[in-house]
Amino acid sequence: VFKEENVLGQKFVVSAEMLVSRSENDDLATSVNYGEVSLFIDNIVRNKVFKLIETLAENIAEGILKNFNVHEVTVKVEKPWAPVGLPLDSASVEIHRKWNKSYISFGSNMGEKSEYISNAIESIKANENIRVNKVSDIIVTKPYGGVEQDDFLNGCMEIETLYFPEQLLHFLQSLEQEAKRVRKVHWGPRTLDLDIVLFEDEIINTEELTV
């Protein structure tokens, strides 16, 4: 990116392909106003400065998903006459983002169990990158693993999130840290336990996450 481009501005061509819920009726109130989406994109492009077209595309996709009744979006940002030193008409980037369905289990068997769980649920609901669809009843379960400890309070929630799996994991771990969780004994007691049970239909096996 040349300095002059940030000062004088650049030309972009933006397209957005959106997946919306099936229309059960002809009610405009439940549809997506494509004119409003176009103006929303135009406002981002005109009034914000980005050094990378990748960042611009991310901001557009995230904004559409958060502000309109859209489940998935593919955003393409094209920069005509990009100064890349080659005879190209343009340079472009295309990204696909969506609300990912996931199931999170929660539990506690130390201290104020109900309060730890309640605070975690409220923090998850307050995160703009997460929508909480359903929260189960909380049940009492016996501890597993042979370590003598108090009974657990357990439950599960269905969410939709803009996070990738590892990003969701890191957010949940930050809530565990806020609850002063200490990882010393395997299968040991804990103030707060938040686990990703399912993430879409993905099978994940990395150094830090197994789903």
Predicted regions and their residues:
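Extended accessory regions or peripheral subdomains of proteins
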Residues: 102-121, 129-130
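Short, surface-exposed acidic-centric catalytic microdomains
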Residues: 23-35, 119, 123-164
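Short beta-strand-to-loop capping motifs
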Residues: 18-20, 108, 158-163, 198-201
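Residue-level signal for inorganic ion chemistry
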Residues: 16, 60, 109, 135, ...
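Flexible, gly/pro- and Lys/Arg-enriched active-site loops
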Residues: 24-26, 101, 144-151, 166-211
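A short coil-to-beta-strand element that immediately follows conserved catalytic motifs
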Residues: 72-75, 131-136, 189
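Short, solvent-exposed loop/turn elements at beta->coil junctions and helix N-caps
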Residues: 2, 78-82, 138-145, 185-186
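N-terminal, polar/charged subdomain of small-to-medium soluble alpha/beta proteins
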Residues: 1-102
